[in-house]
Every structure is written in C-alpha cells, then in structure tokens.
Curated annotation (Swiss-Prot):
Single biological process term from Gene Ontology: monoatomic cation transport
TM spans (from-to): 98-118, 121-141, 322-342, 366-386, 1111-1131, 1143-1163, 1193-1213, 1222-1242, 1253-1273, 1290-1310
Protein name: Phospholipid-transporting ATPase VD
Subunit structure: Component of a P4-ATPase flippase complex which consists of a catalytic alpha subunit ATP10A and an accessory beta subunit TMEM30A.
Species for this entry: Mus musculus (Mouse)
Length: 1416
C-alpha cells in the first residue's frame, strides 16, 4: 500500500528532494527496506574525484580528519518533513500539480469583489478539503518512514573503537567511513565495506544478495589479495594501508580501486572484495571489513530511485482533450463577456440596468464585460474536470487489484503471481503493437540440460540421455508431498530457530528440502533446540538438469585415461591417444571454467526478519554458534591432493619430465570414415619401472582403478551442491560430473577436480576472466597440477572462439588435422543449432611462464586502475585469449515453456508484431522460432547476414522489392506511402519473417540504413535478431518506438534484458532462474510467458476499454452540466448568475455523479475473458484506439450539448410564465440532469451488475436526501438565497415528475437509438463477440467455430493470392538462402522423425560424415 501512496505523489516529489549528503532524502521503497532497491534503473553516475579512505585509528587521526572525516555517516533519513516545515513544504509540493494551481487561482479570483461569483468562503472549501486529505495521508506516510528509519539506524553492530582498542557495540547510524566492522553469520551488512578477513581458511565470505538483485543463490566474496594467508583475525592497530577508490555511484556490478600499503605497493580492488549494505553474511562465522561508503552514499541507497512514473498513451490523449476543454471554456466566457457588454449597451440609458458605483462613477460596458469574463471563469470552472485525475487513479488501483487477484497468473511451482510495479499504465496493455521477446528463460524454461557434445571432431549423441529427457517428468518427492499435506509452503510454517554456520546433517532421505522463503523470528533462548533447520536447494539443480546419462562411446574412451596412460610408463610400446587427452582437457574445462560455488546441500541459510532486528543482541548468535561448535563434527578434510605446492616435493622433476600431454600421440578414432582423414603421429618413447609408477600414483592420490571408479559416482559427489550464476554453467558442471570429472571445491586460490581414474587433482587458480557481452566468452587461467604448465581454458560463442583459434597447434597435431577438427566441429555446431540447442565452444591454450609473467604484469596495471578499468581489462583479456586450440563443443537443450506456441499464435492473431531478440546463434534462434510458432512452416523467411554496410543496404533493398511484389504493390506506390505498413496491413500480404545477425544488425542500426531497415521490418510479421548484445536490444526497441510511434512491450528474464525493458512503453519481467534484475526493472512481472496472452488480450483490453469510456463520460457529464449554467446566461443578461445553489453545484460533481463512473471503470466487461482469449483479433480495436478517437471525443461533446439543451429548455418552456423563483427553477434542472447523466452511463454499460445498480440508485437517493436536508436545515448557509422547502414542494407537484421523465426521455433518445442501430445493423466485432456470451454453450461453440472458420478462409485466400503473385515475379538474392533455410527447418513431427534418424545414424560408422555433409 505504501508503494501506491508513493506513486500518487511521485511526479511532484522529484522537485523537492535534492538535499545534500546525509540529510538529503530520496524516494524510499519499503519492499526492500535494508537494500533499498534492485538492479540500477538509472544510468550509472560518472565517478568524479576519487575517494581516499583512511582507517579510523589513533595513528591516522590527522589524516582521517582531512579525508574520511568529511564523508557522511551511516545515518539514513528517508523522511521528507519535520514538524516545522510540514505545512509549508507539503503545500509547496501539492501546488506543483497544475490542477491545484488552477483551482487556487479561481479561489483567489473569487475574492476579488468585482468578479465574485459565489460566497468567498464556500469556493475555498473543495480545495481545502482536497489539500487536507492529501496532507494527512502524506504526514502519516512520513511518520511511518520516520519510525522505520529510527529502527534501522539503531540496529547494533560491532565496530572497532580506537579508544578502547577492541570491538564494541555501536548503532548503525554512528558508523563512519574508515571504521573497522566485525560481522557474524546471518548478520546484515550495515555499510559498503572492503573485506579484509574471513574465518574461512580460503579467505572466502558467502553473502546473500536477494535484497539487492533478488537472487537467492549465495555469492562468494574474497578477502583482499595479500590478506588471505592470515593465521588470526586482522588487527586494526597493525593496519597501515590506505584505500583509494571511485566516488560513490549506483553501479552494483562495479567497484574500482586499490589498496596501497605503507611500502607503496598496490593491490587492486574489485566488486569481489566489496560487501554491500543490505546483503547478509551466510555460511561464514565471522568477517572483518573497513567501511568505504556509508549512509546515503552506499550503492544500495543510491539505487533507491523510487517508483518510476510513466504516462500512458490514453493519458496523453486525455491531456490534449483537457486543453480543448480549456479552449471551450475560454470561448464560452468570451461569449458571456461580449453578451453582457452588448446587453448593457442596449440598456445604457436605462438607469435601472446601469447602476453607478458608490462614488457615482459609471463603468463602461467594455470594462464590465471584462469583469464578467472572469466571473464566468469562476462560474463555469467545473468544465475542467477536477475530479477526473483523482478518479483515474482510483480506477487504476482497482484494475491493478483485479489483475493481481487473477488466479490464472498464479504459478504453483514458484509460489508467485503477477506483480504490478507501474500503477499508471495499465491501459497501455490494451494497445500494444510491437512485442520484443528474449528467448532463453522467456520463451524457454531456462532449464539447461546437457544434450550432446563434440570432442576432437567426433560427435557424441547421448542417445540414452535423449530418451530420458523425452520421458522425463519431475516427480514430487515424498517429503514435498508431506509438506503440502501438513500446511503448504514453508513460508506459512513455524520458523526454525537461527542456527550456526556449520554443516547440519540432511534428512533421512538425503534430499535437500525447499529453501526457506520467509523471515525467521528472533533467536530465542528457550528450549526446543532440537529443531532441524530446513536445508536449501540451489537453483538449476532439478533432476532433469543434474541427472545426465553419459554417452557409452565417450565414456569408453574416457575410461582409457589411466595413470599408466598419462605417464607413458606402462611398459608397452603404445602411447596415449591424443583424442583421450582432448577428452580429458574438454571435461576439465567444463568443470573449472566457470564461477560455480561448491557447498554442502544441507547448509542452513537462516533469514532474519526486520521485526526481530531491533531486539536481537549479537551475543545470541554467538551463543548459538558456540552450541553448534560443541555439537557438530569438524568438517571432514579432503584427501591428500596434488596441489601446486605439494606436487613439487619428492622427485617431481623426473615425474613431470616424463609426462607429455601433447607429446605426439596418435588419434584413435572410433569411426572408420573419419579415421581415414587423420594422420598417425609418431610415438613418444617413454619407459619407467612399475615401482616408480606406483609412487607417482600415490603422489597424485590415485588409489582406485578406473573400472572401479567408473562403476558409480564418486562417494562425495552426491553431497555437493553447485550454485551457479547461470544455468549453462550448472549444466556443464553436471555433465562433467556424469563422466566422473567432479568439481569438488573452489577457493580463490585453487580448484579441486575429482577424476574416477586419477583421483583428485588440484589446479592452482591464477585468474578468472569473467564473461561479458563484448567478448562473449570467459576464461580461467590455471597451473596444471601434473604438467606444471600455465593453461588457459576458454569457453564461449562459436562465432568468437573460431576466430581465435591457432593455425599451428602446440599439441602435436599438424595444421591439416586442426583444420579437420575445426570443420567437423563447425558442422556439429550447425546441426546442434538446427535442433534448437544452445551451443558453446571449448578451447585451451598453453603458456610458458615467461609469457604468463609478461601478461600478468600488464594485467596488474589494468586491475589497479580506477579510470577506464573495464576497457583496460577487456584489452588485457583479448591479449590472452588468442592462438587457442579447439577442444570441442557442447549442445545444451532448453525446452519451450508450457503454452508458449499457443500464446505466440494468439498474439499474432491479435495483430501484434513479435520480434525475438536473442544472443544465440542463427540456427538455434530460427529453430526455436518455428517451434514456438513465431514462424510457420510455409512462411517466407529472409535472412540478413552480411559483412559490410553497403551489402546490407543492397540486400535489404532486394528483400523489400520481393515483399512488395508479393503484396502486389509496385515499388513506386510503396515508396510514396508516408507511413510504414502496420501489422494489421500485413495480413493480406502473406506472412514473411526476417532473420538478422548481430553484426548485420549493427549495420542496420546506422543512421543511413535505419529507415530502410524499419520499412523492411514493417512488412514482416516476425523478426529474429540473433547474436544481439544488450545494447543492441535497447537500440532496436528505441528505434521502432520512436520512428513508428507505436506502443512497444519488451519481455525478458535476465540482466541483459534490463536495458530494453527500461526504454519501452511497458516492460515485462519474467521471474525465472537468473535473478530478479529484469523483474525489478520492469513495470509488470510474470512467472511464465503464457501469462502474457491473458494479461494483454483480456486485462489489457478491459483496462483500455474501461478507462477510455470513463474519461469520455467525465468530459460528457461536465460539459452537459456546465452548459445548463451557460444557457441560463442568455436569460439573465450574461451576468454570471447561477440558478443553482453553490452547495448543490459542488456536490453534484464531487459526490452525486462521481462514484458510478469509478465503478464502471473497475468492473465493466464488454466481452468475457473466455471470448477474448478465443477471439484474439478483438484486441485490434485497442490498437486502433477505436474506443477513444478524436472523432469520438467531439461526438461526445455534441451529444452533451444536445442533452443540455433539452435539459434546460423543456423545464424552461414548462414553467414559462409562472412566478417561480430562480432556485425553484433550477431544482428540476438539477434533478433531470442527474437522471440523464446516470442513465447515460447505464446505456453505455455492456455488463450491469448489482453493484452498478446499487451505486446508481444510491446516487439518486443521496441527491434527494441532501436536497431535502439542505432545504430544511441550511436556510441561511448561502445568503441571500433561501433554499427552504424547495425540494419538498417539488416532490408534491406532479408536474415536477412529468418534467423529469419527459426531459430524460427526450435527451437520451438519440443516444439509445444509436446504440440499438449499432448493435443490430452495423455491429462491431466486439459487439458481435458480446452476443456470443449470451448464447447457450452449444450455440456459442458453434458460433465461435463459424467465426474462426470465416477468418481462416479469408486468411488462406489472401495468402494464396499473395503467393501466386510472388511466384510470377523474379526471385530476389535473398530468396535462395531462404529456401535453403526453410528446407532445413520442418514441422515439429518431421523434425522429431529426423532427429531420431540422426541419433540412430550417429552410433553407426560413417553416419557422422553423412550427417555433416547434409547439414552443410
């Protein structure tokens, strides 16, 4: 509710929050109180002057005061007001709204005696009431924020005191930059701090960042390099270094700086060393850090931008019409002024009408007319709908409530429903014309399953794994069923007590329980400590993803990897085949080339609720930790490993000298046809005795035979939990584990991998070069434990890896063999992509120590740089990632989500043009497009894949010419069109699809080709942009939106989709497995793509229709009622006199006629949800804005003028010649106007419920009750008028009832006849669909069938006509490529048949070659 209140005042709050440093206030989002936001929705602030952080110690006192003492403390203040400034500041903010200023001007104007229209005090009442209500609401909200701020600021943490020389309890608000802070497990980090110590022996700290980015997976942060090898906790008194870093900014993914020791030695700092405010320490007993940013300068607080404000298309249209109403008001007031001047001129000589001023002066008619103009402004002010904007906001809140209450949006597996984060653009959901969708995680499940691989040029189909996936169904475990039976989700169960950070044994089944989803209660000290904490389950760890079935051929080859084979000391004449060593390196790369965190599956992750923070002393956690230290068993130590240090003992030189990983062995191909292409390589002569071999086996921990090891998974593998940042990494690690190459542990210094036949090997981790969208790859630099060589393992997109391969390999193969491997792998990659698999290439590089030292020196300079660090690091990575040796490729399957094809088809029928923007390769994207029905088998597909900008322009011209011929439109006629063809125009042209690659898209986005590109895409129903970067995605959305002037809707699930989500009219985030960045940046968040169809086709249609008609109704009722006052001016000399008491005039719009349109705007349903989903083409009415066109607005005003004429002159002629007074004449006018206005809404309503009727009758009764009470009790409220008994007298007069009935009938007759004729003679598609809802089920089904059949026949006929026209023309340069692509992509059934045949052929000799040639 707080967010709703914040949004209502967001547009004027921005102008008054620019305060400095600790006292500045920013809009606050209480959804994430401690973290204050998610992924930054604003452009990162440029770092200006660098920040120098000096330790808060006695020895640095003077320097500290000069630097760190000038920074803000950790106190936060999100309140806006104080007791002294509340009234003036709140009024200042409220008067930033133009409507409030307008009515304030009218109040002041009414205090001018010459233009006064009503009693002065009365005119102030409406504005005062509105301002008071909003002020009370703002005050209560601000007081609530004050209490929460106070609670947070008074939280306790451990801060090192330079006076007491120890850590003491200190409030968060007193923490300053330079303080040393000690945190325990499960504590929330109070400020941004650099990690200096961790109790973990490897210098690792685990944190949970769900408050920042929504990701529940644990993240690793590491101690600053040089502080890892500490035997004891860091002593602040011995800390003699200083920190220099960038100025505070809101970029959560970046931290640049360095730590400079007393000897001027520098150590680079990155985000891996930074603990952010709002995160929680997990699985680490204690950490120590130094504060670098505090309070409002922390990254979390800088990301707290509050709710974003967007204006909908309908709101912009309404604002334009408000200006037309202002113009109409001015015209009516000018008419009144001129009329009064003319009237006075006619009676200038008659003193009865020309009364002089008290001083005897006579005012000229011209000046009097000027005064009357302003009097008329006050009198007719209601023409500007003051209650319109308030009513719109109330209606939108009601619409949001019903959207969020729709059970069809509930995802039972994720226990989540739709989130409406933008509250003012619901109606735009009904007018979307372009949809931009990510692929992975949006259209697909984002459950990456290892499907196939290619190693050393040989394809491995994994047939058994394919069969498992086809028949796989995730079964609910007995434990989960029991949980559901006992009380639903864990969030609804009693919270377990907080536990220590040591490992707790898992349950009897050995399966991890669901992760805790709620906050725990405060740590108690009562009994019942026997509660077992629920264990957590990592993401990307469902059985479908983890249970990989190995390929038997590949497993047989990998089983040849024995200690004797590696060392060449088996006493035989054979040497190890090169292919086996390729396989070994391939799986090593899969296991270690990632950032996967390895942990036990049953480690508890307790959460601390805000309600318990204030009363939870730190010593409670310490007591619980001590209990578990006494009760738990020490972590079992790993077996003896061959780390870089250990393996050098003994006689390593002799051992390593005899190992030749790439020492000219020969390939041993399994297929005859492929083996003929590879030359044999001379053997290496190696010999040794058995005794030496056994010693070496013991040195590397090889204690089991390969046959025994391969018979089952390693004993410890089932106890490991992999937490990956992306599902691809997890899938590759699980695939390596399936081949008994198990990632056992990872620290900042080393990675341990367990081989079935070799035991555990420890790789010294030298560097990790993370993935980025520029390089499209990641690498790890390790020192091999056996060869002692520096090896670079790289994985990434095939488009970039293939360009980085070395011509002359250093592994004993000649260039011809490398070329054969490369060509085979490329054929396999193309085949994988055509099957819709996600592809990656794996490569390696061996470096000498000299080469590595030279690269390291340059890389160190990049790491310690603050300015341009990202660019320098990319350049350094590119210097390393070259001259690679290709090891193989992987194909990972990511299945479509349930209901995606049906949703895509429905959105197509709704006239929405859909673009797929993906980073995958072309073949994969096209295959998924066919699978999800974005493309149909008979669609004409055009491919844009060029290497130059000129070629791109020529190809686009050729494709455009072909499309124009297919549409039977000459190029001259097409080029003469001012506007591009819209989606609805393309229905009769035959469907066309366009595929464009990332590099070609870069050319197309150039200014010289933008218009041509947009014109081409406007002719296509579907566009696929593959290999697109996040920046290109946002540029495409902006280009289409700005040039076509259409409403755009991007949808995505990952951080790479945030940019395009933010630049569009409506952004949709999918809450998937890649964190919550997209959700936090979106306007609406859903859990599955199929929910989008109902959100747009049903709720979008309803919201647009309701709000459009409600806005038109407000204009109608205000114009109709104000014109009664205007027509009366013709009979009172345009004097600005009202025939209605001002109290009635005020409440007529604010009370008697305001509630029914609000109910209409919330509950109106022109067509049922079932019909809207079955007939998606009804959505096109919203795209064409049929409910609210400019013509509709002016027709509504003309109808209002007509009804006001009838409402005025029927009573006028009825009472003409009678002796009734002015207010007695005005009473039947008001009563008839009330009936006309309320019944007008009844005629416009498509679905009347008991709520509609109750509100309508209630409005009428409240009017009569008020009129009777006012006439009896408020006789002298508005002197000199006397309303005593007016309504009572009229209710006793039959003529009054006759006048009201006759007036209402005559006024509404044209509107009623128009609606009758519209529904019977020329019904719109929406009205026809409305009739279907009234039919019995059998007749309704038959009617819908006829509707769809007619639409299908028309569509097929138009398609056949366009295809015949296309066949008569000459083919374009792109058509041959299209035919090739279409021939390679078939329907779903044919594709499954072909895949089965390929799988069978893959296991037979010679089949791989045949498959590769056919694919090429």
């Amino acid at each position: 509710m707080t967010e709703l209140l914040q949004w209502a005042r967001h547009h004027w709050r921005r102008l008054s929050h620019g305060r400095a440093q600790g006292e500045d206030e920013r809009p606050y989002n209480y959804a994430s109180l401690l973290a204050c936001g998610g992924k930054s929705s604003r452009t990162p602030r440029p770092a200006g002057k660098h920040r120098v952080v000096i330790p808060h110690l006695q020895c640095f006192k003077d320097e500290y005061e000069r630097f760190s003492g000038t920074y803000v403390n950790n106190r936060i203040r999100t309140t806006k007001y104080t007791l002294l400034n509340f009234v003036p500041r709140n009024l200042f903010e409220q008067f930033h709204r133009a409507a409030n200023l307008y009515f304030l001007f009218l109040v002041v104007l009414n205090w001018v005696p010459l233009v006064e229209a009503f009693q002065k005090e009365i005119t102030m009442l409406p504005l005062v009431v509105v301002l008071t209500i909003i002020a009370i609401k703002d005050g209560l909200e601000d007081y609530r924020k004050y209490k929460i701020d106070k609670q947070i600021n008074n939280l306790i943490t451990k801060v090192y005191s330079r006076k007491e020389k120890k850590y003491i309890d200190c409030c968060w608000k007193n923490v300053t930059v330079g303080d040393f802070i000690r945190l325990s497990c499960n504590e929330i980090i109070p400020a941004d701090m650099v990690l200096l110590f961790s109790t973990d022996p490897d210098g690792i700290c685990h944190i949970e960042t769900s408050g920042l980015d929504g990701e529940s997976n644990l993240k690793q942060r590491q101690v600053v390099r040089g502080y890892t090898e500490q035997d004891s906790e860091v002593d602040p008194e011995k800390f003699s270094s200083r920190i220099e870093c960038e100025s505070p900014n809101n970029d959560l993914s970046r931290f640049r700086g360095f730590l400079e020791h007393a000897n001027k030695e520098r150590v680079g700092l990155s985000k891996e060393n930074l603990l952010l405010r709002g995160c929680t320490i997990r699985n680490t007993e204690a950490v120590v850090g130094i504060v670098v940013y505090a309070g409002h300068e922390t990254k979390a607080m800088l990301n707290n931008s509050g709710p974003r404000y967007k204006r909908s298309k309908l709101e912009r249209r309404a604002n334009t019409d408000v200006l037309w109403c202002v113009l109409l008001l001015i015209v009516m007031c000018l008419t009144g002024a001129l009329g009064h001047g003319i009237w006075l001129s006619r009676y200038e000589n008659m003193l009865f009408f020309n009364i002089p001023e008290p001083d005897g002066r006579v005012i000229s008619p011209v000046l009097t007319g000027f005064y009357v103009f302003w009097t008329m402004i006050i009198l007719l002010q209601v023409l500007i709908p003051i209650s319109l904007y308030v009513s719109i906001e109330i209606v939108k809140l009601g619409q949001i409530y019903f959207i969020q209450s729709d059970v069809d949006f509930y995802n039972e597996k994720m226990d989540s429903t739709i989130q409406c984060r933008a509250l003012n653009i619901t109606e735009d959901l009904g007018q979307i014309q372009y949809l931009f969708s990510d692929k992975t995680g949006t259209l697909t499940e984002n459950k990456m399953v290892f499907r196939r691989c290619s190693v050393a040029g040989f394809d491995y189909c994994h047939e058994e794994n394919a069969k498992r996936l086809e028949s796989y169904q995730e079964a609910v475990s007995e434990e989960e069923e029991c949980t559901d039976t006992l009380g639903g989700s864990l969030s609804n169960m009693a919270r377990p007590r907080a536990q220590g950070c040591r490992t707790v044994p898992s349950g009897p089944l050995g399966k991890p329980s669901a992760q805790l989803s709620g906050s725990t209660s405060a740590v108690g000290n009562g009994e019942g400590s026997g509660e077992v904490p629920h264990s957590r389950q990592a993401a990307f760890s469902s059985p479908m993803e983890t249970d990989v079935v190995p390929d038997t051929r590949l497993l047989d080859k990998f089983s040849q990897l024995t200690p004797q084979l590696l060392t060449g000391l088996d006493g035989t004449a054979q040497s190890s085949p090169l292919e086996t060593l390729y396989i070994m390196d391939f799986f090593i790369a899969l296991a270690i080339c990632n950032t996967v965190v390895v942990s036990a599956p049953n480690q508890p992750r307790q959460k601390i609720g805000l309600s318990s923070l204030g009363g939870m002393p730190i010593k409670s956690l310490e007591e619980i930790k001590n209990i578990f230290q006494k009760l738990s068993v020490r972590r079992s130590s790993s077996p003896s490993l061959a780390s870089g240090k250990d393996s050098s003992s003994g006689t390593p030189c002799a051992f390593v000298s005899r190992i030749s990983f790439f020492s000219r062995p020969k390939l041993s191909p399994p297929m005859e046809d492929e083996s003929s292409q590879m030359d044999e390589i001379p053997q290496a002569s190696n010999s040794a005795c058995c005794t030496e071999t056994e010693a070496q086996n013991r040195a590397v921990g090889l204690s089991v035979s390969s046959a025994e090891a391969l018979s089952g998974p390693p004993p410890s593998a089932s106890n490991l939990c992999y937490e990956a940042e992306s599902p691809d990494e997890a899938a590759l690690v699980y695939a390596a584990r399936a081949y008994r190459c198990t990632l056992q542990s990872r620290t900042p210094e080393q990675v341990m991998v367990d081989f079935a036949a070799l035991g555990s090997l420890t790789f010294q981790l030298l560097h990790i070069l993370p993935f980025d969208s520029v390089r499209k790859r990641m690498s790890v630099v390790v020192r091999h434990p056996l060869s002692k060589q520096v090896v670079v393992y790289t994985k990434g997109a095939d488009s970039v890896i293939m360009e980085l391969l070395s011509v002359a390999a250093s592994d004993g193969t000649n260039p011809e063999q490398q070329m054969i491997i490369r060509e085979r792998t490329q054929r396999h990659l193309d085949e994988y992509a055509k099957r819709g698999l996600r592809t990656l290439c794996v490569a390696k590089k061996v470096m000498s120590d000299t080469e590595y030292a030279e690269w390291l020196r340059n890389h160190f300079l990049a790491e310690t740089s603050i300015d341009n660090r990202e660019e320098l690091l990319v350049e350094s990575a590119m210097r390393l990632e070259n001259k690679l040796t290709l090891l193989g490729a992987t194909g990972i399957e990511d299945r479509l989500q349930e209901g995606v094809p049906e949703s895509i088809e429905a959105l197509h029928q709704a006239g929405i043009k859909i673009w797929m923007l993906t980073g995958d390769k072309q073949e994969t994207a096209v295959n998924i497009a066919y699978a999800c029905k974005l493309l149909e088998p008979d669609d004409k597909l055009f491919i844009l894949n060029t290497q130059s900008q000129d070629a791109c322009g020529m190809l686009m011209s050729a494709i455009l010419e072909e499309l124009q011929k297919r549409a039977q439109v000459s190029p001259e006629l097409a080029s003469s069109r001012k506007n591009f063809p819209q989606p609805s125009d393309a229905q009769g042209q035959g469907r066309a699809g366009l595929v464009i690659t990332g590099k070609t898209l870069e050319f197309a986005l150039q200014e010289s080709l933008q218009r041509q590109f947009l014109e081409l895409t406007a002719w296509c129903q579907a566009v696929i942009c593959c290999r697109a970067t996040p920046l290109q995605k946002s540029e495409v959305v902006k280009l289409v939106r700005n040039h076509h002037h259409v409403l755009t809707l991007p949808i995505g699930d990952g951080a790479n989709d945030v940019s395009m989500i933010q630049v569009a009219d409506i952004g949709i985030g999918v809450s998937g497995q890649e964190g919550m960045q997209a959700v936090m940046a979106s306007d609406f968040a859903i859990s599955q793509f199929r929910h989008l169809s109902k959100l747009l086709l049903v709720h979008g249609h309803w919201c647009y229709t309701r709000l459009s008609n409600m806005i038109l109704y407000f204009f109608y009722k205000n114009v109709a009622y104000v014109n009664l006052l205007f027509w009366y001016q013709f009979f009172c000399g345009f004097s600005g006199t009202s025939m209605t008491d001002y109290w009635v005039l005020i409440f007529f719009n604010l009370l008697f006629t305001s509630v029914p349109p609000i109910i209409y705007g919330v509950l109106e349903k022109d067509v049922s949800a079932e019909t809207l989903l079955q007939l998606p083409e009804l959505y096109r009415s919203g795209q064409r804005s049929e409910e609210y066109l400019p013509l509709t607005f002016w027709i509504t005003l003309l109808d209002a003028f007509y009804q006001s004429l009838v409402c005025f002159f029927v009573p006028y002629f009825t009472y003409q010649g009678s002796d009734i007074d002015i207010f007695t004449f005005g009473n039947p006018l008001n009563t008839a106007a009330l009936f006309i206005i309320l019944l007008h809404l009844v005629i416009e309503s498509k679905s009347l419920t008991w709520i509609h009727m109750l509100v309508t009758v209630g409005s009428i009764l409240s009017y009569f009750f008020f009129a009777l009470a006012f006439g009896a009790l408020c006789v002298t409220c508005n002197p000199p008028s006397n309303p005593y008994g007016i309504m009572r007298k009229h209710m006793l007069d039959p003529v009054f009832y006759l006048v009201c009935v006759l007036t209402t009938f005559v006024a509404l007759l044209p509107r009623f006849l128009y609606r009758v004729l519209q529904g019977s003679v020329f019904p719109s598609p929406v009205l026809r669909a409305k009739y279907f809802d009234r039919l019995p089920p059998e007749e309704r089904a038959e009617a819908l069938k006829r509707w769809r059949g007619t639409a299908k026949v028309n569509h097929v006929a138009s398609k056949h006509a366009s295809q015949s026209a296309a066949m008569s023309g000459r083919p374009t340069p792109g058509s041959s490529a299209v035919l090739a692509m279409k021939s390679a992509t078939v329907s779903t059934v044919e594709q499954s048949t072909r895949e089965t045949a390929l799988d069978r052929g893959c296991s037979e000799p010679g089949a791989s070659k045949m498959t590769g040639s056919s694919a090429s």
